[in-house]
Amino acid sequence: MDPNEKAVYLTFDDGPIPEVTPWVLDLLDKHNIKATFFMVGDNIRKHPDEFRMVVERGHRIGNHTFNHIRGFEYTAKNYLGNTEQAKIFMEMGGDINCNVEKVLYPLLFRPPHGHMFANQYLTLKRTYKIVMWDLVTRDYSKRMRPEQALNN
């Protein structure tokens, strides 16, 4: 990620989700676009087929903790442990036989809700490239109409 490069990076959080991930992957394939998926470890456990689809199509994967926990609500030990649990699970390929090395390294991390304490950040940045976001469409809101999300 060259700061001087003019680029747009598409990222998707909280997956894999069977109702959404295949549709997003098909749309990305249609336009020959690669993206980064910040995965929740427990969702990988619950939806290994969707995890495999992301990996096999060559998209990057990043760590989004095992249980999508908020850093401000946990001690550093618990937060870092939950993050490590997700990392181990992703390195194992989510208990499925797929090669994740080409899409997992270098390690990326995005904190759920964008929140974590400074000590959590300082520890994680030794292992991960911390990736935040510039634009939140709020497309996850049940009260948000598609047109509103598009205009965010």
Describe every region a protein language model picked out.
Residues 1-72, 78, 85, 89, ...:
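Active-site beta->alpha N-cap acidic-glycine motif
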Residues 20, 69-99, 115-152:
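Alpha-helical scaffold elements lining the catalytic groove of polysaccharide deacetylases
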